[in-house]
Amino acid sequence: MYAFLTGPMLWASLLVFFGGLLARVIWYIRGLDWRLDRVAYKPHLAIGLQGAVQSALKWLVPFGTYSWRQQPFFTVAFFLFHIGAVLVPLFLAGHNVILEERFGFSLPALPMGVADTLTVLAIIGLVMIALRRIALTEVRILTTGYDWFILAVSAAPFVTGFLARLHVGDYDTWLLAHIITGELFLIVAPFTKLSHIVLFFMSRGQLGMDYAIKRGGATRGPAFPW
């Protein structure tokens, strides 16, 4: 089972993940209206890209935007989870062993203590996000079973992996559960809200280009005929 999950199934999961996310990016770009978007973006690409990068970077800094500062609890929860969600899967030593075995390369590995800390903080962040969905009326009434499914899919690889790391119960069982839930995440990501892995950058980039080109950002230089 382990050989299958870290061999053919891993290849298939990564193919779906990267292929699906690439398709989402292509569909997003093709969905732009040439009369409203492309006609402005192409002639003013340089200033548009500058606005796109600035827009994305501001939202990647904790409390870097007004909206983050207005929701401190959610901001802390969001960054606790997402920092771990990026760093642990990519730089965990155990993951890089598999990368080296299956693909012939590896990334720098986090110290085990750092990886453990990031994992615990990521789980705490997910618990905080879940509590927010329960406690805030305006969030609770919009929450559906689909949202809980996304939270569960996001949490499962961290929880199962950490239980395996601590050798709670049967190690092999938790290890297989960790691999299965991790590959489930990869497979469902392109087809769910988890596609924000790339669509966040697309949407923030589009808004940044809009503000830089169309909505007054360009007044710092020569006026554009918009």
Swiss-Prot record:
The lineage of its organism: Bacteria, Pseudomonadati, Thermodesulfobacteriota, Desulfovibrionia, Desulfovibrionales. Keywords: Cell membrane, Heme, Iron, Membrane, Metal-binding, Transmembrane, Transmembrane helix. GO terms for molecular function: metal ion binding. This is Protein DVU_0532. It is found in: Cell membrane. Its cofactor is heme b. One of its GO terms (cellular component) is plasma membrane. The chain crosses the membrane at residues 1-23, 46-57, 73-99, 112-131, 141-164, 194-222. Disulfide bonds: none annotated. HMWC (high-molecular-weight cytochrome c), ORF2, ORF3, ORF4, ORF5 and ORF6 in the HMC operon form a transmembrane protein complex that allows electron flow from the periplasmic hydrogenase to the cytoplasmic enzymes that catalyze reduction of sulfates.
